[in-house]
């Protein structure tokens, strides 16, 4: 009952989130009274198709989102009774000048593709609304965004999400099939929500260079086939969850340069054909479980484990697993450097692989 009352309370515009001068920004694309065609706020937006050079901040902090360059202004769009600001995916963006001290707290973002709450740390200076450089954004249009210095409670976050959904945002990401570049270079993210990704097939570059994430939720990736660069450069990861990758075929550079990752789970690689550079430069990676590659469908492991720190048991596990796969046609390359050389068990596996046409390079030069 208390939760329901709180939800009702916050379905009104979330002004209470900023009571007492709490820092942050509250930007609504559906409240046309806050939209201007120019960055100074002199020319109001009055019709669909007009450019947006300013969204006035409704938090009381005057952290307005502006764009002084006319060619980089997004468009105000009204379709099916819903008001949104649409990005061109090239250079459109608005910028908030984050004050000294920055923001550490919660960001709630409502878009045409989905709505979610994130933990963030945003340093002082210019911060892009509309994705990094106008390129990377989880949707095509924004409905609203709240950034608060100080974490929102679960109830506050849920109610703010509901507020955006009631005003035209899509409730979840459950209908999205391609997450390509959605959160790429979002280095401000410190935590990622358990959103619905069950329809996702394409995760290319989805979390590329989310450098401040230290963990990742057990999202549903059961339909995912393409994971190229998906978590590349997530330098804060120390572990990775046992997500469902049973449909995954391409894992090229998926965890490239995750230098804090120390171990890896026994994910399902049974449909995988390409693992080139998958764990390249994971310099702290020591532990790979036995059987990880027993059922793979292809042998492209070019530089897959170069610049890692694998234990002898782990490199043996990998080599024995590749033998178990039975791959004897197509691309057959395996590279490891750094870490331990294989034992006699691993060396025997290398001999078998080479007899099947594999090119194998390992620490120690066997």
Task: Say what each PLM segment does.
Residues 29-37, 41, 59-62, 113-116, ...:
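Acidic glycine-/aspartate-rich tracts in secreted/extracellular proteins
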Residues 92-95, 117, 126, 131-141, ...:
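Repeated polar recognition positions within modular binding domains
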Residues 99-102, 170-177, 187-201, 211-225, ...:
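Structural signature of tandem-repeat unit edges
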Residues 8-34, 82-152, 169-171:
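Extracellular glycan-associated modules
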Residues 3, 16, 341-366:
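Extracellular/surface-exposed low-complexity segments
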Residues 264, 303, 332-336:
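Conserved hydrophobic beta-strand positions in leucine-rich repeat
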Residues 2-67, 141-144, 152-172:
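GGW-centered surface loops in extracellular recognition modules
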Residues 52-100:
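Low-complexity, glycine/proline/serine-rich flexible segments
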């Amino acid at each position: 009952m208390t939760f329901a009352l709180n939800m009702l309370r916050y379905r009104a515009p979330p002004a209470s989130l900023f009571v007492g001068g709490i820092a942050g920004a509250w930007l609504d694309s559906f409240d046309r009274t806050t939209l201007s065609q120019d960055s100074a706020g002199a020319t109001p937006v009055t019709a669909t198709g007009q450019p947006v050079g300013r969204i006035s901040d409704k938090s009381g902090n005057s952290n307005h989102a502006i764009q002084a360059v006319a060619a980089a202004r997004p468009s105000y769009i009204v379709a099916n009774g819903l008001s949104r600001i649409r990005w061109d995916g090239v250079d459109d963006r608005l910028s908030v000048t984050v004050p000294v001290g920055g923001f550490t707290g919660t960001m709630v973002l409502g878009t045409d593709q989905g709505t979610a709450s994130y933990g963030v740390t945003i340093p002082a200076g210019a911060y892009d609304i509309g994705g990094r450089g106008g390129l990377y954004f989880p949707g095509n249009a924004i409905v609203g965004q709240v950034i608060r210095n100080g974490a929102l409670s679960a109830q506050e976050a849920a109610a703010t999400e509901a507020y955006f959904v009631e005003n035209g945002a899509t409730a979840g990401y459950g209908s999205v099939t391609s997450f390509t570049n959605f959160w790429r270079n979002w280095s401000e993210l410190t935590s990622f929500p358990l959103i619905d990704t069950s329809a996702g097939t394409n995760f290319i570059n989805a979390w590329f260079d989310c450098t401040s994430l230290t963990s990742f939720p057990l999202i549903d990736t059961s339909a995912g086939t393409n994971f190229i660069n998906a978590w590349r450069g997530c330098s804060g990861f120390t572990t990775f969850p046992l997500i469902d990758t049973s449909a995954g075929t391409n894992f090229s550079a998926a965890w490239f340069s995750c230098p804090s990752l120390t171990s890896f789970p026994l994910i399902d690689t049974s449909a995988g054909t390409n693992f080139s550079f998958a764990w390249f430069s994971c310099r702290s990676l020591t532990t790979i479980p036995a059987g990880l590659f027993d059922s793979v469908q292809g042998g492209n492991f070019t530089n897959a484990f170069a610049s890692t720190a694998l234990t002898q048991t782990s490199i043996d596990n990998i080599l024995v697993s590749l033998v178990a796969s039975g791959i004897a046609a197509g691309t057959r390359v395996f590279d490891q450097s750094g870490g331990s050389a294989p034992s006699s068990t691993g060396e025997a596996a290398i001999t078998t692989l080479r007899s099947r046409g594999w090119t194998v390079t390992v620490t120690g030069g066997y």
